[in-house]
Amino acid sequence: MKSRLSFIILLMSLSISGYAQQIVLTPQWTAQSQFAGYYVAQELGFYKEAGVDVIIEHTSASDKALNRMLNKKCNAITMLLFDAMCQIDHGVELVNILQTAQRSGHVIVVRDDQIKDIEDLRGKKVGIWRSNFNQLCLLIEKDYNLNIEWITFIQNINLYISGAIDATMAMIYNELYQLRASGYENKKVIYLADIGYDYPEDGLYITREYYEKYPEKAVAFAQASRRGWQWAHEHPEEALDIVMKVIEREDIPASRRHQEWMLREVLKQQIPTGESEPRFELNHEKVKALCELLLKHGRINNEINADQIKGR
């Protein structure tokens, strides 16, 4: 009887230990090609082969990724580097284990044809997200003393189409496609990367608690995720099939053509300017440049370097 009880206790302890090591990943938005590499890693068994139990749970308008992490509903999220540095400075225990986007995907799409460059936005009405994606734009306004009248939106392009604004912020992989598909393919686009604001964006972050408690699992998770992204680079059409399967399962309205555009642009972002292959680690010089911008505008109080962000 005692041996049987000991066996049951052992099984329970193993089960609890396995659950504790489980990784719940929450991307910063609903299912789309922006997160293709993670879907690939899960669908093709890369996580399982690496010995990590990964569940992907998407966010919603009322349950943001960072809030889910802070409330211990997940222990891994995707996040912009800009936002991550601010959160780390404010005491949030985050560790970057994989940097996916090496280049900026932020653009300004002009509607008023009199606007030729960033200086021409002075005093204009410009659409902007009601989310953390808006932070870099606000600092650029201060750098150029533009006195922009920001008009907030959540995710659609209706303000632009209606003519209520003179220009709009957009992501190269999302709203830019929507605008071009709506007949605005010839409008001028100002790429933030071209005016000196080319900072890394999306990265994969895990709680410091998990990183320190299960370092081997954290590394295996990062490596399997990287493998998923690399596979997406080599098999974009098949990766898109996997994305569409996830989108259908999540019951998200989305067109394959839009997701194809998004995947292509997201994969481009992973290749540093002037190079031909993707990189999946932080660029120390770009982190330093972004840190200087954040310090200049009082968004962070302490200098943060790439090693700190990587938990070293």
Model-derived features: positions:
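N-terminal hydrophobic or amphipathic helices and topogenic motifs
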Residues: 18-55, 273, 281-312
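Bacterial N-terminal signal peptides that target proteins for export
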Residues: 1-7
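Short, glycine-/small- and polar/acidic-enriched structural segments
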Residues: 21-153, 157-171, 198
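Short, surface-exposed acidic
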Residues: 147-150, 187-189, 249-264, 301-308
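Pocket-lining segment of extracytoplasmic ligand-binding domains
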Residues: 82-83, 155-252
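Structural motif detector for alpha-helix initiation sites
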Residues: 117-118, 208, 306
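Secondary-structure end/capping motifs
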Residues: 214-297
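N-terminal signal peptide c-region/cleavage motif recognized by signal peptidases
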Residues: 13-17
